[in-house]
């Protein structure tokens, strides 16, 4: 028997948006604001928060997801043996960093590459600026942020405990995905933006009997009539096994002027002679840390695809 087959079907199908995803259960909001508690028909997989779907109403507030409509974007991470879908149809990635814990720049770079691959606009948000202490720490943080500003990424510095007002105009008209490592204050930020968010999180935690009210699922909140915020669990790692080498390279936006300019058309920008990317790095035109991050990502692809070998040029 397929999942949900024991639910009595009623009426015709409705189109709605997945506003919460936890396990195999989903909340789908249809026109007028009615929310159905849904499961997926059969063995269909891949439904994610933010998806536009067609559901078949069942008894009461129950429903069955029958179809997932085409997406404009899909933000997810992928390891060698599994992938984790996070959100669909996001137009903006708000990557949250914090003074404490210290900035994980590799995690930021990986998420920027994922966003670039899907055409999602990135916004870098530094939270907890009230905790910046010594001059050395302040200078280090300022140096990191200036680098990304010079790349062309918007960067905002706030303390969610003091005021989120500077962030509000940047959320207007967007479906913004909040992402970042654990402990950077995403929950505090969300609760300041959407006062009901904490209550909604607690309700799902109670329903799942999880015993904890930290974010363990993905949920969409309406910020205003034209804007939404998708909250996601914190993470410490972000694999990009879904991307090939060309997509990885293009994900580092400062690499783009040099791509296609190398001596060899199939240059992988690892150690090939005549590589314009490596030459630019040697001349100080590209950041060595970002080059190293790209090389690490390519090396990770080789581990998941053993047949892939570095081209040797002479």
Curated annotation (Swiss-Prot):
This protein's record includes keyword Zinc: yes
Enzyme Commission code(s) on record: 3.6.1.-
Domain of life: Bacteria
GO molecular function annotation: GTP binding; GTPase activity; metal ion binding; rRNA binding
Residue numbers binding GTP: 127-130, 180-188
One of the GO biological process terms: ribosomal small subunit biogenesis
PANTHER family, A to Z: SMALL RIBOSOMAL SUBUNIT BIOGENESIS GTPASE RSGA, SMALL RIBOSOMAL SUBUNIT BIOGENESIS GTPASE RSGA 1, MITOCHONDRIAL-RELATED
Family statement drawn from the similarity comment of this UniProt entry: Belongs to the TRAFAC class YlqF/YawG GTPase family. RsgA subfamily.
Described function: One of several proteins that assist in the late maturation steps of the functional core of the 30S ribosomal subunit. Helps release RbfA from mature subunits. May play a role in the assembly of ribosomal proteins into the subunit. Circularly permuted GTPase that catalyzes slow GTP hydrolysis, GTPase activity is stimulated by the 30S ribosomal subunit.
Listed name of the protein: Small ribosomal subunit biogenesis GTPase RsgA
């Amino acid at each position: 028997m397929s999942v949900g087959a024991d639910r009595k079907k009623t009426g015709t199908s409705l189109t709605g948006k997945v506003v919460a995803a936890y396990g195999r259960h989903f909340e789908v909001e249809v026109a007028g604001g009615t929310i159905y508690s849904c499961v997926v028909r059969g063995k269909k997989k891949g439904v994610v928060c933010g998806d536009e779907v067609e559901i078949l109403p069942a008894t009461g507030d129950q429903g069955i997801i029958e179809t997932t409509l085409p997406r404009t974007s899909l933000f997810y991470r992928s390891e060698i043996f599994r992938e984790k879908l996070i959100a669909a149809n996001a137009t903006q990635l708000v990557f949250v960093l914090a003074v404490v814990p210290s900035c994980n720049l590799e995690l930021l770079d990986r998420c920027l590459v994922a966003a670039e691959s899907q055409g999602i606009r990135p916004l870098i948000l530094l939270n907890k600026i009230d905790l910046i202490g010594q001059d050395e720490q302040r200078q280090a943080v300022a140096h990191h942020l200036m680098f990304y500003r010079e790349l062309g990424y918007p960067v905002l510095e706030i303390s969610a405990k003091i005021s989120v007002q500077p962030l509000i105009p940047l959320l207007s008209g967007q479906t913004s995905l909040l992402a970042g490592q654990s402990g950077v204050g995403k929950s505090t930020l969300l609760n300041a933006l959407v006062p009901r968010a904490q209550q909604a999180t607690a309700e799902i935690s109670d329903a799942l009997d999880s015993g904890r009210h930290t974010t363990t699922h993905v949920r969409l909140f309406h910020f205003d009539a034209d804007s939404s915020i998708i909250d996601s669990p914190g993470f410490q790692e972000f694999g990009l096994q879904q991307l090939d080498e060309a997509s990885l390279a293009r994900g580092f936006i400062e690499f783009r002027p040099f791509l296609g300019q190398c001596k060899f058309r199939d240059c992988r920008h690892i150690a090939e002679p005549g590589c314009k990317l490596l030459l630019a790095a040697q001349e100080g035109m590209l950041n060595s840390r970002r080059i190293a991050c790209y090389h690490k990502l390519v090396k990770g692809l080789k581990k998941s695809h053993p047949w892939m070998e570095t081209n040797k040029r002479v």
